[in-house]
Amino acid sequence: MAPDPVADIVVDARGLACPQPVIALAKAVRDAPPGTIASVECTDAAARHDVPAWARLTGNEFLGERPLAANKTDGGAFALTVRLR
């Protein structure tokens, strides 16, 4: 398995409810060039559907999901990563 790509842009959307994580991601990458890797850190399970759908609809590449380091305050946080095309 290949290592996780290093994100050029990281969006902290933990604690935000749908559709805010995908909106925050879209705003953060608005002026980013193709090839940019962006990761959005989330706690809202709906983002697992929204971010890949956004990537598909905008012609970008969804690279996957990874859990964030577990601690007592993370609320089951995870990161969703995309590559801009």
Question: Can you say where each PLM-predicted feature lies in the sequence?
Answer:
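Class I SAM-dependent methyltransferase SAM-binding "motif I" and its flanking Rossmann-like core
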Residues: 1
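Intrinsic-disorder/low-complexity, polar/charged segments enriched in Ser/Thr/Lys/Arg/Asp/Glu/Gln
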Residues: 8, 35-39, 77-79
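Amphipathic, hydrophobic secondary-structure cores in small proteins
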Residues: 13-63, 67
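Immediate flanking context of iron-sulfur cluster ligation sites
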Residues: 4-13
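C-terminal edge-of-domain segments
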Residues: 67-85
